[in-house]
Regions:
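Small-molecule-sensing regulatory modules
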Residues: 1, 5, 25-38, 44-45, ...
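Signature of uroporphyrinogen-III synthase
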Residues: 13, 49-53
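Short, structured active-site "lid" loops
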Residues: 1-19
Length: 239
């Protein structure tokens, strides 16, 4: 396996031309490139929205964009969105510092990637309308080309890391008399692993639980009399 570090904006083009088998880039960047690709796996990081924004205090909606100047680093995404709404506008491509273009008189509104909104607020801007697109880092492949066996191995390994990030491994000791109730709280994927302890009438239990539910699960186990409750991160998991 060879890895190439390229400009995120160019990755979809390399994949579409068959130069690369798989690529990791932002969904927004891939779509703006107008390259032909298939999204294979969302990776759950680098999340953002692509929004229109205007000076704070001004009331805007997308119907008012007809004939206006719109500054953006993603002209193809903007043109496609405007076309969907039957709007013609002057789309001005800028490679950076899009937020300041209104203050400098270059544009009436902007269209830009918004993560936390801090940069927009610092420039006195506020988003309006529905998001043009919701983006995150994704794995892409060339359209119409089947994933090879070697590529599937790479994808499975990535998916294993994503699975591991959403689960914790819970270990605890509990009285045999409370095992059924505890197992109902920690069912795992196909059932918890139960092992006898030297302490008579007690067992050790291990199960995977969704990370988002970990505190509630541990609270419930405590109520059931469980002891030595431990939660461990997973590095990789195959389901």
């Amino acid at each position: 396996v060879e890895f190439f570090f390229l400009r995120p904006k160019d990755i979809a083009i390399y994949v579409a031309r068959g130069v690369l088998d798989l690529g990791i880039t932002g969904r927004d960047l891939a779509l703006d490139s107008k390259a032909s690709f298939d999204e294979v796996l969302p990776l759950g990081f680098g999340g953002s929205t692509f929004r229109y924004a205007a000076p704070q205090g001004e009331e805007w909606d997308i119907s008012q964009l007809d004939g206006r100047r719109i500054a953006t680093s993603y002209p193809n995404l903007v043109r496609a969105n405007l076309a969907e709404h039957g709007i013609e506008a002057d789309v001005i491509r800028l490679d950076g510092a899009v937020e300041i273009s209104i203050r400098l008189g270059v544009a009436d509104v902007i269209a830009d990637v918004v993560s936390t909104g801090t940069t927009l607020r610092q420039q006195g801007l506020a988003p309006f309308g529905e998001p043009i697109i919701e983006s995150e880092a994704v794995v892409i492949k060339r359209t119409g080309v089947e994933v090879s066996e070697e590529e599937q191995v790479v994808l499975d390994r990535m998916q294993g890391i994503l699975h591991a990030r959403t689960y914790l491994m819970i270990d605890y000791n509990i009285a045999q008399s409370n095992l059924d109730a505890a197992a109902g709280t920690t069912p795992g994927l196909t059932g918890p692993t139960v092992s006898p302890l030297a302490r008579e009438g007690w067992v050790a239990v291990r199960a995977m639980v969704p990370k988002k539910n970990a505190n509630q699960v541990m609270d419930r186990l405590s109520q059931l009399g469980a002891e030595a409750i431990l939660a461990s991160d997973l590095r990789i998991a195959r389901f």
